[in-house]
From Swiss-Prot:
<dbReference type="Pfam" id="PF21175">
    <property type="entry name" value="RecR_C"/>
</dbReference>
<protein>
    <recommendedName>
        <fullName>Recombination protein RecR</fullName>
    </recommendedName>
</protein>
<comment type="similarity">
    <text>Belongs to the RecR family.</text>
</comment>
<dbReference type="Pfam" id="PF13662">
    <property type="entry name" value="Toprim_4"/>
</dbReference>
<comment type="function">
    <text>May play a role in DNA repair. It seems to be involved in an RecBC-independent recombinational process of DNA repair. It may act with RecF and RecO.</text>
</comment>
<dbReference type="InterPro" id="IPR000093">
    <property type="entry name" value="DNA_Rcmb_RecR"/>
</dbReference>
<dbReference type="Pfam" id="PF21176">
    <property type="entry name" value="RecR_HhH"/>
</dbReference>
<dbReference type="GO" id="GO:0006310">
    <property type="term" value="P:DNA recombination"/>
</dbReference>
<dbReference type="GO" id="GO:0003677">
    <property type="term" value="F:DNA binding"/>
</dbReference>
<keyword id="KW-0863">Zinc-finger</keyword>
<feature type="zinc finger region" description="C4-type">
    <location>
        <begin position="60"/>
        <end position="75"/>
    </location>
</feature>
<dbReference type="InterPro" id="IPR015967">
    <property type="entry name" value="Rcmb_RecR_Znf"/>
</dbReference>
<keyword id="KW-0234">DNA repair</keyword>
<dbReference type="InterPro" id="IPR034137">
    <property type="entry name" value="TOPRIM_RecR"/>
</dbReference>
<keyword id="KW-0479">Metal-binding</keyword>
<dbReference type="GO" id="GO:0006281">
    <property type="term" value="P:DNA repair"/>
</dbReference>
<keyword id="KW-0233">DNA recombination</keyword>
Length: 199
């Protein structure tokens, strides 16, 4: 992988970079070579930032998103509409909804989606915790804002069936979001319209 057989640190860096989504061997090598050849100070800053984030960022006790405290600032915000709960797959999806400014409710972040082929079932993405949160007596509407991929649709369907069976009002983002897309890559106007036109 790296030139020479004594480059264990470089090989380890390339392998670590390959763990990032969408990064293959060549991209990882380019990044590693760039950091070591042109930006050693940037490499140190990146290393410290990764270490600090890994040590201090955890899951919110209420919504499961990332936070440095026990409970995230969104869950603690008294101006939020606690009667509306948007269910998203990832913190990136939550951030995409927040950037629209069209949603002032609260969130529940699944940290994944159902994927039976990969062995990911309801327990793996916090169905139980979501049911507890949605059934707290405060939540009046659960908005399913999972992605419009096959797994996201399956997750939304399973959640919808389970929540409706418990007498909860469930809506889904409108189809203004293109099928096969992921929220963090959709333009803000489309997301805002999808929220307003949800069914």
């Amino acid at each position: 992988m790296a030139p020479g057989s004594d480059m264990h640190s470089l090989d380890a860096l390339v392998q670590a970079l390959r763990r990032l989504p969408g990064v293959g061997v060549k991209s990882a090598q380019r990044m590693a070579f760039h950091l070591l050849q042109h930006d050693r100070q940037g490499a140190e800053v990146l290393s410290r930032a990764l270490h600090d984030a890994a040590q201090s960022v955890r899951h919110c006790a209420r919504c499961h998103t990332f936070t440095e405290g026990e409970v995230c600032s969104t869950c603690l915000d008294p101006s939020r509409d606690a009667s509306r709960l948007a269910v998203v797959e990832t913190p990136a999806d939550q951030a995409a909804l927040e950037r629209t400014g069209a949603f002032r409710g609260l969130y529940f972040v699944l940290m994944g989606k159902l994927s039976p082929l990969d062995g990911i079932g309801p327990k793996d993405i916090g169905f139980g915790k979501l049911l507890e949160r949605a059934g707290d007596g405060v939540v009046q509407e659960v908005i399913l804002a999972t992605n419009f991929t096959a797994e996201g649709e399956a997750t939304a369907h399973a959640l919808s069936e389970t929540l409706k069976a418990r007498g909860m009002h469930v809506t889904r983002l409108a189809r203004g979001v293109p099928v096969g897309s992921e929220l963090e890559y959709v333009d803000l106007g489309t997301i805002a319209h999808a929220l307003v036109d949800r069914r």
